[in-house]
Swiss-Prot record:
This is Cytochrome f. Binds 1 heme group covalently. It is a single-pass membrane protein. Its main location: plastid. GO terms for biological process: photosynthesis. Its cofactor is heme.
């Protein structure tokens, strides 16, 4: 009886330990996945600087294209698509954090006019939902619903990202007006070269921090190198650490200069930004335009009928 109780107690403890481990794993994974995409959120109140530069360019140093497509005009309280395209060669592989090669990821930030925001799920049509796929968008800040971010997500599947946007209604929001508004977008493909704290990632070139002779190159067990440079002037030893990923360009005994590249530049990605314009159209103005066009068409029809009637009268008088 005692043995059976001990077995039950051990079984209960093992089950509890497994459950706790799973919970910790899930929570950790969730926090990492939620925090990782938006490095800029931690350091910048607004992703667009006063100069117009989007802050993602501070970490993604290479310049690459990005494209945005929106309707020319939208009516109030209407859901529309903002399509962001982040083109790149799908055959390319990037250096991952562990130094291995892998597929590129993409990300985007969409800066909408005040009042525009992500459409609620119950307002999104099945057609737009199909284009969205499994993407999950979030606001840059809880109080900045007009700034949306996404990523990183697999580039091979989401090089074209469809944002479902809800336009504001000036009838309910008095600070919104029927005007032409700018929309800004930034999009990156691949990992960045600089982390928010200013340190380098392994997806960039590493330069010599001193001039002299490469006296020793030590290949580290987990990848990467320790390069010892002997300063020719005072014999001082300087050690440069190269993480796994970049390919080494120098060899032992080689004379190098300060800031000379020690590695290749493995970066194949980059960041780009663009803009578009959209008009929040007054429905009454549209109705007025339609009424005007209808009036013009009717006037043309009456003129044609009147002309034909006049021609008939003239013809009858000539016959008489």
């Amino acid at each position: 009886m005692q043995t059976r109780n001990n077995f039950s107690w051990i079984k209960e403890q093992i089950t509890r330990s497994i459950s706790v481990s799973l919970m910790i794993y899930i929570i950790t994974r969730a926090s990492i996945s939620n925090a990782y995409p938006i490095f800029a959120q931690k350091g910048y109140e607004n992703p667009r600087e006063a100069t117009g530069r989007i802050v993602c360019a501070n970490c993604h140093l290479a310049n690459k294209p990005v494209d945005i497509e929106v309707p020319q005009t939208v009516l109030p309280d209407t859901v529309f698509e903002a399509v962001v395209r982040i083109p790149y060669d799908m055959q390319l592989k990037q250096v991952l954090a562990n130094g291995k090669k892998g597929a590129l990821n993409v990300g985007a930030v969409l800066i909408l006019p005040e009042g525009f925001e992500l459409a609620p799920p119950d307002r999104i049509s099945p057609e737009i939902k199909e284009k969205m796929g499994n993407l999950s968008f979030q606001s840059y800040r809880p109080n900045q619903k007009n700034i949306l971010v996404i990523g990183p997500v697999p580039g091979q599947k989401y090089s074209e990202i469809t944002f479902p946007i809800l336009s504001p209604d000036p009838a309910t929001k008095k600070d919104i007006h029927f005007l032409k508004y700018p929309i800004y977008v930034g999009g990156n493909r691949g990992r960045g070269q600089i982390y928010p704290d200013g340190s380098k990632s392994n997806n960039t070139v590493y330069n010599a921090t001193a001039s002299g002779i490469v006296s020793k190159i030590l290949r580290k067990e987990k990848g990467g190198y320790e390069i010892t440079i002997a300063d020719a002037s005072d014999g001082r030893q300087v050690v440069d650490i190269i993480p796994p990923g970049p390919e080494l360009l120098v060899s032992e005994g080689e004379s190098i200069k300060f800031e000379q590249p020690l590695t290749s530049n493995p970066n194949v990605g980059g960041f780009g930004q663009g803009d578009a314009e959209i008009v929040l159209q007054d429905p009454l103005r549209v109705q007025g335009l339609l009424f005007f066009l209808a009036s013009v068409i009717l006037a043309q029809i009456f003129l044609v009928l009147k002309k034909k009637q006049f021609e008939k009268v003239q013809l009858s008088e000539m016959n008489f």
